Amino acid sequence: VTMPITGPVARNWADTDIITRTQRLGLNVSTTTNTAQIRQTIVYFSRNTSFDLLTGFNMAENATDTAIRFFIGISANIVFTNVEPNTLLNCVGICRLSTSNNLHIVYNDNTGIGTTIDLGSNFPANTISTDKYLLKIKAVSTGIYIKLERVGTAFSYETTLTSDIPSTSTGLNFGAYIVDTSGPNTTTGFDWYGSYIMTNN
């Protein structure tokens, strides 16, 4: 599956802290309203085929800014633009809304505004290269299971989503994006740790 990346930047390894010890790829963008993103050009799994996704990330450049939009997870998108993550259709993932400093779970079916769960101050989205997150999204018989872990802490959140989610036959893929929605041009980014997706076709 082709995976175009917009705004890649190398991150150096160093035995300094939980972030620098992680093999990771930075994605950033220096122009306001433009997106840095990683995406897949086709959809290739669904709830019917079953899927099990594991990925990881941390917020990086300009995370203290108050107008950032961020999403990482599964969706039917093959390209991302400067939109609030809760307007994405057929998605399940983790996001930062431009109105919040916390991470949220976001999910939506093929219509309307998505549902969000504010994970609160124990899951900050406005820290720069300090908080490491692991994300698991999995199709289960009753819906879609999602778990976010803040590595090195006691904080994790997990739930099974049963409504306002993609249908069993909707084609999906993996993707992530970040955008600074307003203000002067400032480099804004996140780090991606790679993804593992297992499907049972």
Regions found by a protein language model. Name each.
Residues 57-59, 74, 139, 150, ...:
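Short beta-strand segments enriched in hydrophobic/aromatic residues
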Residues 131-145:
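Localized edge beta-strand/strand-to-loop motifs within extracellular or lumenal beta-rich domains
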Residues 1-23:
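Extracellular glycan-recognition surfaces and repeat-rich motifs
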Residues 76-78, 109-111, 150-154:
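Solvent-exposed strand-loop boundary residues in beta-sheet-rich modules
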Residues 108-134:
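Short, aromatic/His-centered strand-loop micro-motif at the edge of beta-sheets
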Residues 25-103:
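Secretory/extracellular carbohydrate-interaction modules
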Residues 164-201:
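Ligand-recognition surfaces built from glycine- and aromatic
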Residues 149-172:
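Short, solvent-exposed beta-strand-to-loop segments that form ligand-recognition rims
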